[in-house]
Structures are given as C-alpha cells and as structure tokens.
Amino acid sequence: MQNKNSMLFRSGKNLLVYGLMFIMLSIAVDWYRKPSEPNAFAQQVFYDLQQQPKVIAQLSHQKPMLLYFWGSWCNYCKFTSPAVQQLMDDKVAVLSVALKSGDPQQVADYLNQENYHFPVINDPDGEISKSWDIQATPTILIIKDGKVVQHTTGLTSYWGLKVRLWLSSLT
C-alpha cells in the first residue's frame, strides 16, 4: 500500500514539475516573440474592411481591448479565432489584422465562411504586421489606454484570453 502511495506521489510530483517547465517555456517563447510597438500607434487611424475608421486609443480608453494578428492560412488561428469571436460577442473591444490573407474580398469571403464578425484591417503585404515586429500568428495584444499591457503568441483559449483581459482591467 505504501509503495502505491509513494508511486502516486512521485507521479504527481513529476506532473507538477513538467507542468511548471511547460509554463516557463511558454513564458520564455512569448517574451522572445514580443512585438514592438510602432511610434504613435495608439493615435493612428486604421480602416477596416467596411472602411470604418478605427483608433486604438479610443477603443482601449474605457477598458482593455484585443488586437489580434491572424492569417486565413494559419492553422493555429483556426482554433484561436472562435475564441476571439466569442469575446467579441461578449462585448470585448476587438480589432484584428489579417496578415497576408488576400485582397479585401478574399478576406471578407473567409470571414463569412467561418461566420466571424470581428472588425478586420487587411494587411495583404504584411506592412502593418512588420511595423509591429509580428513574428508568429496568432499574436494577441491586450491594449489599455493606448498601451500594450499583455501579449501572447500561438494557440490560446477563450478562458486564457478572458483571464488576461480581467488582469489587464485591474491595472
């Protein structure tokens, strides 16, 4: 009986160690891939696919907003985009950038096909993403009062984003 408990304790300890190593590795990768904010980005006017002006400073003034860099060709984005859409449905301010996903009509067709309704700035040549030093998709920035307060790259969940938004609202 004691041998069984000892083995169970050892397994739990190993699981904890591997879990902590995974978290530390994820943090290190996020730090390495940290985007660079372009000068005066918060005041810059962007136009979405419907030609509606979007200003990050205004969108992030009342509460944190999500800036989501994605691509229609990105496999991880296929798992992250539904979470972003769900946050949009929850009334979170979302602005997204479609990186090298085609002309505006191709991006609009993709959004309709996937039933996504978040506002999209098309970045067909990657110039906007390059100005932010985006190295991977998906990349998600949480911006509050015109300042990037959190970021993450790669696969993430609705609840992971929800917690990050909540933590950002506390500062």
Language model regions located:
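Structural microenvironment flanking redox-active thiols in thiol-disulfide oxidoreductases
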Residues: K78-E114, P124-K130
